[in-house]
């Protein structure tokens, strides 16, 4: 029986997130009014989340190639070669809007989705990281959101069985109505067994794998492409529900059918579910796709074609199967207790045809849905340059030691232990360096190789100067990987911005991308995967521009990794890199002086590369006993973190007369490291560094149980540690 078609009104088009000109483009493309299912398909494929229509033009400027890159952007995840027929597969992706509406499930399914992106490529996940941005601590929703998101990330990762080894947590009032949950997953695969999404061959069976389809997550991708308002909490039904135990079964079943050589192409059902997975597989392979929705396993009776095509139920995959392997593949999935259903086949027509109940519900051109979606060159204006702050013009309201006591326990700089202790960071037994250091270190199989992993960005720099902020995010990832002894190899990015229809916001995105591209070229770390999340604003107020950078580096021998903890008393403390006392956009200027202003510190990429190469050499030769990169909070914060980690104090010289004390100790100049070396090796190290033109200054030595600066009162390391560890648990317990 034929159902009565739904009239397509301007209101219905608008509710699907399509602009009037985009709807006119659809009419011209298909030569008729679309059905409701077709409108839903266009809405899913042409939204910002799936099509990158506002950013695609500018993403083309990113460097994506290197001899060690096996797969760059455009697939489920990026792939790099690390030798010995081993490949690392990794990507970072956002789940921002769902996590604000339903923090536990939003964060959990964000982790689940990124894990699927990695194992779809044939890799076994070995580590997760995340970058979490929350509103101001005093905002009434913040505590609830932190609690839910952290529980969701931990609950999914811990149950699935992958360690969560590092990340970032920040608080800022600009995220009050729009938190960010960026999840990164890293997997290990055989370099000659990488599985891609492009279908090949006509008449090949298309198989639905995994969990059943329900009504959860319908319009999830469209919601991720919209701005928020006061009624956004009503969108809770569009948040997907995750089952990490089903995902673990799906992982094992997928890796088993891959090993059995059953797979032509495979794609995870993520944003826009069955629609995007089927369209992407066909479009990438220059093939059409016919789907029969009567064959789709459903969780609820009476689901319409529209609902099935747009559902974002979790733990599902779509595969193009080698026909002769059907019985073997089905047996594997039945063994793991998962659905296996042939729901369609590839065609030579370049049409996307969807049938349900004996009727054709959609018949559309597949290329125009996929890689030929709309592309916008949106108007953008460059962010105005801010004046350079001169440190001598900033009068310190309190002394250096008082400032240290205040900053080390502040929301910006305090320990994140409360967060990472809720994650299982050692499951699998390969975590060499746990959270709390510059980068996580994960052993590969039984060694000797290891991976250095980090996630970095400084949003306040990106707003003040998007170009320098973009450069700094990459440079910070480079330094963090270097500080543990890793050689940075490649990057995944997660670009979180406000409304791209506002020229100043589009200008932030363009500026950050220019800086990121320049840094990636200079530091030889190409972008191999990524994600763009736009429209992160509530009631017209955008987030801070937050291009999260996920970095992956390689250690030839994980036993030679460095940590930030002081190791012994009597060692020389060296400051590597040039210090000018840059206070613009520093934590000190904001939190101690109450001023959010000035140009951020400039990033000299030549100095970053030169200094990083020297520090890695010191680690590999065994000269460096402790290493820490300098970032938020500057020199004195980094020294305090090293002292706290090692339970050893330091006797520090006063800073040079040319730089005022508060700028020397709290300036945030880039390309700097702190390194300790044994006293008997000091002269040799200083001579070598001078010969290669690397600025280096001995600023003190490790000693005792206090941090003491010449001319200032000493402060006990235990007191610093208490202040550093106290704020977050007190806040989450309602005491701060």
From Swiss-Prot:
Keyword rRNA-binding attributed: no
The name this protein goes by in its record: Phosphoribosylformylglycinamidine synthase subunit PurL
SUPFAM superfamilies registered for this protein in UniProt: PurM C-terminal domain-like, PurM N-terminal domain-like
GO biological process, any: 'de novo' IMP biosynthetic process
Reaction(s) the record says it catalyses: N(2)-formyl-N(1)-(5-phospho-beta-D-ribosyl)glycinamide + L-glutamine + ATP + H2O = 2-formamido-N(1)-(5-O-phospho-beta-D-ribosyl)acetamidine + L-glutamate + ADP + phosphate + H(+)
Annotated S-S bridges: none
Protein location: Cytoplasm
Classification via Gene3D superfamilies: PurM-like C-terminal domain, PurM-like, N-terminal domain
Keywords, in A-Z order: ATP-binding, Cytoplasm, Ligase, Magnesium, Metal-binding, Nucleotide-binding, Purine biosynthesis
HAMAP family: PurL_2
Record organism: Rhodopseudomonas palustris (strain BisB18)
UniProt subunit comment: Monomer. Part of the FGAM synthase complex composed of 1 PurL, 1 PurQ and 2 PurS subunits.
GO cellular component: cytoplasm
GO molecular function, one term: phosphoribosylformylglycinamidine synthase activity
